[in-house]
């Protein structure tokens, strides 16, 4: 029984490491971040909805399923600030319309008040919470496009 529990514990640690590796692979590294930007601890989400979704994802888990892992990168420069939210779900994400409605409301697209852009692929959701024109957002989008083909 003791060996079985050790085996199960090892599997859980291994699977948690694999999940975090997926997000780590698509996050911007310090070498990829332009010099004028710095990583910060403070959230720079542009809308309350994006911030709430990241901080309390279990609030909506009955709709979109359980989250395996989540991470956020917060950036600021003299000209720009924003956050990239990374959410990884246990199963393929099938609630894209719900997330769009939650973030954008009736417009179903980015607005001045809710400028976030949303990317969904399999079980991963990425939300860029920046103003519409952002060098860092475009850099991240290109990396994710390459990494998640």
Model-predicted segments: where are they?
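N-terminal hydrophobic targeting signals that begin at the initiator methionine
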Residues: 1-2, 24
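Short, functional N-terminal and low-complexity linear motifs
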Residues: 3, 62-67, 107-111
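Sec-dependent N-terminal signal peptides
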Residues: 4-14
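Sec/Tat signal peptide C-region and signal peptidase I cleavage site
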Residues: 16-20
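A short, solvent-exposed beta-edge/loop patch
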Residues: 21-33, 74-90, 99-149
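Secretory pathway targeting signatures of secreted, lumenal, and periplasmic proteins
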Residues: 38-80
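Primarily extracytoplasmic ectodomains and periplasmic/lumenal surface modules that are beta-strand-rich
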Residues: 92-94
